[in-house]
């Protein structure tokens, strides 16, 4: 009886540890897939930058003012710069 109880408790402990380890591994894999902090900061900054806005300075004579454009691996989508 004691041997069976010890075996059941040991099996339960191993199962709990295995489940916890599997969850931690899954979380670490999800973190590896995500972008590094430096890229996240760039995305946050660029997300706030509108790439297709009217000029801050009004037209001078016949010259059209230039609209801001995305560059460096970014493209304009829905009036916002997004990473290509």
From Swiss-Prot:
Coiled-coil-forming residues are: none
Domain of life where this protein originates:
Eukaryota
- Give the UniProt keywords, A-Z: Disulfide bond, Neurotoxin, Postsynaptic neurotoxin, Secreted, Signal, Toxin
The residues of the propeptide are 23-47
Query: Sorted alphabetically, which SUPFAM superfamilies does this protein's record hold?
Result: omega toxin-like (SSF57059)
Subcellular localization, per the record? Secreted
Q: Does the keyword Transport apply?
A: no
By its UniProt entry, which InterPro entries does this protein fall under? Hwtx-2-like
Record Pfam families: Toxin_20
Main localization, broad class: secreted
Q: Name one GO cellular component term.
A: extracellular region
Q: Which Cys-Cys disulfides exist here?
A: 51-65, 55-76, 70-81
Q: Where are the membrane-spanning stretches?
A: none
Q: Does the keyword Disulfide bond apply?
A: yes
Q: Which residue positions does the secretion signal occupy?
A: 1-22
- How would you summarize where this protein is expressed among tissues? Expressed by the venom gland.
- Report a single Gene Ontology molecular function: toxin activity
The UniProt similarity line reads: Belongs to the neurotoxin 12 (Hwtx-2) family. 02 (Hwtx-2) subfamily.
- Give the function comment from the record: Postsynaptic neurotoxin.
The protein's name is U4-theraphotoxin-Hhn1a
Which taxonomic lineage does the organism of this UniProt entry have?
Eukaryota, Metazoa, Ecdysozoa, Arthropoda, Chelicerata
């Amino acid at each position: 009886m004691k041997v069976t109880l010890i075996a059941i408790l040991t099996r339960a402990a191993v199962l709990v540890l295995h489940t916890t380890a599997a969850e931690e591994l899954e979380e670490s894999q999800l973190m590896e897939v995500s972008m590094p902090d430096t890229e996240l900061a760039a995305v946050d900054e660029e997300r706030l930058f509108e790439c297709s806005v009217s000029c801050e300075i009004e037209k001078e004579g016949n010259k059209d003012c230039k609209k801001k454009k995305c560059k460096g691996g970014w493209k304009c989508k829905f009036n916002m710069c997004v990473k290509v």
